[in-house]
């Protein structure tokens, strides 16, 4: 080797190469930033579109003048006043039916007032406007209402109200709520997690800690990964064939003396959703177990622990944050599914709350779908309110997953 020869790059060549590296890095940084901005803009547009539909002007008329039922202003009616008005003006059959559903005397003033407007006064919604139009075109909308509907009242309304959350389904958008749908969704995810979590955890523990690494295990693992990507409608068809038809005596409740139902119950739907999230839970639990340092296992074996003792006392406690996080995120997917529930037999219109696993049911995504397909604009407005409720439920689940992961996470 010649000691006088310079093997280092020349200053000009070095600077050119360095400039190219910085230029390439800047381009990729700009691309990554652009991707982030596109994602933020898309999510913001989605949220704005939903919120925009949940608030705005509403033009409505009373089919019957409230003065024919009471001389008091509507905002001064007490609970006792409303009870007397409803009893005097509703037919005996209609009043008895309402009283059987829930005793009239135990209903709140807001509930009685809604019944008064729905059954007696009968609000007729003429038109609705989005929040943006209501703000930017307020004067134009008022003039339009005065010309088209001279007897109509115009008010800025939030369709997402406490009454909306506690009211059942109704054929009139002004009185419809999401209570029945929310309860149905909670029943569904409860049954799904009770079915899928124990089975998924057990399968993942066996595959990761006990199963021999041979061709059969690889085939099973590959199929589990494939099942996680199968379209949800396929699980709906599977649930229809197995839980609704083959297992009808169990899922309908006839084995337990329930004779007014068939296999299209909330139990069938919950088990179907459990099948849907089962591959996800198995994969998530496996990944959580893989993240546990192998040194913990070796230390337990060195102290004389059996494989079961090692798994129960060391592996699972350390994998718990990942197991909980993955399971809750899997529930988030189940909460937003629609296609399997429609195939299994969910109701698109039902006003009776589910009272057990053998009840008829609906779910929040199905309710949203049913409202968005209606021609009346007021149903689109309450669909936007229901979407906000669904997003809040999903956000709650995701936040719970993060908090539980941080609470139980262990650092090594």
Feature map (PLM): residue ranges:
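Transmembrane-helix boundary motif in ABC transporter permease subunits
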Residues: 192-224, 237, 402-407
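C-terminal transmembrane helix and the adjacent membrane-cytosol boundary/short C-terminal tail
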Residues: 286-294, 301, 328, 369-412
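Transmembrane alpha-helix signature in integral membrane proteins
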Residues: 38, 176-205, 327
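Membrane-topology segments of multi-pass transport proteins
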Residues: 1-31, 37, 45-175
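Membrane-interfacial helix termini and adjacent extracytoplasmic/periplasmic loops
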Residues: 157-176, 211, 235-275, 345-346, ...
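Glycine-rich helix-loop "coupling/hinge" segments at transmembrane-helix boundaries
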Residues: 334-377
């Amino acid at each position: 080797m010649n000691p006088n020869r310079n093997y280092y790059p020349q200053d000009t060549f070095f600077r050119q190469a360095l400039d190219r590296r910085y230029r390439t890095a800047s381009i990729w940084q700009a691309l990554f930033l652009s991707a982030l901005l596109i994602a933020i803009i898309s999510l913001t547009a989605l949220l704005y579109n939903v919120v925009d539909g949940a608030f705005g002007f509403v033009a409505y008329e009373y089919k019957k003048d409230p003065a024919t039922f009471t001389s008091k202003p509507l905002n001064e009616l007490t609970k006792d006043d409303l009870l007397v008005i409803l009893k005097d003006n509703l037919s005996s059959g209609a009043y008895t039916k309402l009283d059987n559903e829930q005793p009239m005397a135990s209903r709140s003033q807001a509930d009685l007032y809604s019944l008064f407007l729905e059954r007696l006064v009968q609000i007729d919604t003429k038109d609705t406007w989005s929040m943006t139009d209501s703000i930017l075109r307020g004067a134009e909308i008022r003039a339009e209402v005065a010309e088209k509907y001279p007897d109509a009242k115009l008010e800025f309304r939030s369709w997402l109200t406490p009454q909306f959350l506690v009211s059942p389904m109704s054929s009139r958008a002004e009185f419809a709520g999401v209570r029945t749908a929310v309860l149905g969704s909670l029943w569904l995810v409860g049954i799904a997690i009770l079915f899928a979590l124990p089975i998924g955890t057990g399968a993942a523990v066996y595959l990761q800690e006990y199963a021999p690494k041979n061709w059969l295990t690889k085939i099973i693992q590959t199929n589990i990964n494939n099942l996680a990507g199968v379209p949800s409608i396929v699980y709906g068809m599977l649930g229809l064939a197995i839980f609704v038809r083959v297992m009808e005596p169990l899922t309908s409740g006839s084995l337990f003396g329930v004779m007014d139902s068939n296999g299209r119950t909330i139990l069938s739907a919950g088990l179907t959703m459990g099948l849907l999230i089962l591959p996800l839970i198995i994969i998530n639990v496996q990944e959580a177990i893989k993240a546990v340092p192998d040194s913990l296992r070796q230390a337990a074996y060195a102290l004389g622990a059996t494989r079961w003792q090692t798994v129960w006392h060391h592996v699972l406690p350390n994998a718990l944050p990942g197991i909980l996080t993955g399971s809750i995120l899997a529930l988030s997917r189940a909460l937003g599914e629609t296609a399997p529930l429609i195939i299994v037999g969910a109701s698109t219109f039902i006003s009776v709350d589910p009272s057990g696993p053998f009840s008829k049911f609906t779910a929040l995504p199905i309710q949203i779908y049913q409202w968005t397909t209606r021609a009346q604009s007021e149903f689109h407005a309450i669909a936007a309110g229901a979407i906000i409720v669904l997003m809040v439920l999903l956000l709650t689940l995701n936040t719970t997953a993060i908090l539980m992961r941080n609470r139980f996470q262990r650092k090594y």
